[in-house]
């Protein structure tokens, strides 16, 4: 699939999202539910801000010493009997994974939820050599059989679908004949997937966090599918972004606590799995061969820059769950497998601005995302930095907008010009004004007036209003008098 999803323009995607009433209602309901659950989990933990600071320090320290911890991880995985491959690009990662599949003569591959495998387009790469890849996460499974519909949320990929739509998908693709009852739908999916686990030649997982000190990988799930993917197939492949690492189990304990509470409002998910070695003598299950693929794919270019904090992300989607923009347009509007505020920051860093220059502007800069982030990523500040890069370094600002801003800057910096401008604006704009508002504006105003009215400029300037009403006619209470003395 890759990071980019679809070929529609940003405006087309947003319009489609706004027109999808069900999606907007589903997102709104989910945001409210998750926000309340997270708040309760924070309160139960206590000292939430101190926990956030500690989590931020862990992520910052790890990234500042990433080369050391990756080397330690690699050495320990090798000591445990596994193989490690560092992939600089998505293509390199896919070539290595395909080589393993061909060597094992794999026909069927079972896979647990993984954002980085979506990012590198791994499924499509394996399908190109004749492998059948089965998604075992329920949400991802629904999307896969629905003609590879892309995910719209980092944690809940099928958030944009309702139970009736899922029933129709199961009926059309898998012969389902029962109701749209969620329990019946889940049991049906379970029956379908269980046989896939038993027949799989290779199991592939993502990695929530790798533990450098022991060479372990950890998986945090609520469905248990990842455990089956790592115990039944004889060969296991784990794919991880190079930043998804912690120094020790002690730091893991803290970050998993933050991840579960921030993602779904739970103290702990149903399954937290740590895997360290291949199957040993006497073991009844587990892989006989283990491969860890560590993916760069642009991450090293972010290290040491003003955007490095974006790599602190632990993929909890807390920022998405409070974002007012995501609430109204949904995940697909971002045109990336990484939606929401973190997607608007991360996607241009990994893919460039050519297809994603609108994303940093898909924000009200309300900072709700920054306040929600369990590792204190200053998301709204990073979005502003992106805008500055787009305007000053990339020179991508539309000419009309650039000229308008330069013109305003010139006028605003010259008191006499500003006075003339505010005095003349109502008369200049009067041909466009009707019933106290501008309904169709020219140039830079067009984007605004295409979807909302712009209040007309008043003929009485604020300075004139203040001269006649401000000084002598505004009541000053004791507080005001004290402050003015």
UniProtKB/Swiss-Prot annotation:
Entry keywords, A to Z: 4Fe-4S, Electron transport, Iron, Iron-sulfur, Metal-binding, Repeat, Transport
Pfam families registered for this protein in UniProt: Fer4_8, LUD_dom, LutB_C
Matches recorded under InterPro entries: 4Fe4S_Fe-S-bd, 4Fe4S_Fe_S_CS, FTHF_cligase-like_sf, Helical_ferredxn, LUD_dom, LutB, LutB/LldF, LutB_C
Keyword Electron transport belongs to the record: yes
Transmembrane segments: none
Binding site for [4Fe-4S] cluster 2: 323, 366, 369
Boundaries of every 4Fe-4S ferredoxin-type domain copy: 304-334, 353-382
Binding residues annotated for [4Fe-4S] cluster 1, in chain numbering: 313, 316, 319, 373
GO biological process: lactate metabolic process
MF term (GO), any: 4 iron, 4 sulfur cluster binding
Assigned protein family: Belongs to the LutB/YkgF family.
Functional summary from the UniProt entry: Is involved in L-lactate degradation and allows cells to grow with lactate as the sole carbon source. Has probably a role as an electron transporter during oxidation of L-lactate.
The name this protein goes by in its record: Lactate utilization protein B
Species annotation: Halalkalibacterium halodurans (strain ATCC BAA-125 / DSM 18197 / FERM 7344 / JCM 9153 / C-125)
Gene name linked to the record: lutB
